[in-house]
């Protein structure tokens, strides 16, 4: 059995789909369906069982056995970069993750987890090293702190000549693609621009967006990276992006191209995002490629075109 936490979320459900595509369906999905709309991400997927997140945490902390587990993909987290309840964020993204990590280490279960490019903050160097990290919000800090916790475990194991089971973290950059309709304001730019155009409006970007560039990565490619690392048993913390920074306007132009009409309009930059907004991200893929991962990443033009075709049927 493979366990996918956050399995009803965007990345988690795409990992489940990729597993299904490979003929694997002995999967336990763990999530919180308080937002019942997320169930739609599971309707077309084959899984063995579903468990509520709180029940799962309780059983993990009690040391309960779930039977033979081949791997755990830990995608469950509060992913809202605009959430400032630090106690809530640290409990969900840090404490819960530590409990699950030690559960896996004790049983030698491969543990593949979601980190984030939000760990880097305002920098133009995106290398998986401590010196380049400086989160701008509490979400990014929770991910940064968990990465550092994992690093300390590796250092301690090395000092004592011990070898830990597989632990692999992925610093996701700007992920977009299918199964994100439940995310509200945290859904991708492509999703929001498409909704605007379907409502008869022009696509709207923040003022200054011509200067903002992000590494936009297609969710299908993210799932492929996760499965590659499971299949190859490689540990480490790795950037998961395309290695290319593209302007927000490129996303808007891809959406406009699909619809065959429209032009970009600008709106004021939100006050609440000032000082907590990454204006530039670009994954350095040196470490990912050195590990042997050869997954090819779609450009914005190709990825958004595929995405638009899927959600505008």
Swiss-Prot record:
Identify the metabolic or biological route this protein is part of.
Nucleotide-sugar biosynthesis; ADP-L-glycero-beta-D-manno-heptose biosynthesis; ADP-L-glycero-beta-D-manno-heptose from D-glycero-beta-D-manno-heptose 7-phosphate: step 4/4
Task: Give the protein name, as stated in the record.
Answer: ADP-L-glycero-D-manno-heptose-6-epimerase
| Gene3D superfamilies in UniProt | NAD(P)-binding Rossmann-like Domain (3.40.50.720), UDP-galactose 4-epimerase, domain 1 (3.90.25.10)
GN (gene name): hldD
Assembly notes: Homopentamer.
What is the role of the protein in this entry?
Catalyzes the interconversion between ADP-D-glycero-beta-D-manno-heptose and ADP-L-glycero-beta-D-manno-heptose via an epimerization at carbon 6 of the heptose.
Do you know which InterPro entries this protein is assigned to?
Epimerase_deHydtase, Heptose_epim, NAD(P)-bd_dom_sf
The positions annotated for binding NADP(+) are 10-11, 31-32, 38, 53, 75-79, 92, 143, 175, 183
Assigned keywords, A-Z: Carbohydrate metabolism, Isomerase, NADP
Active site (catalytic residues): 139, 183
Essential cofactor(s): NADP(+)
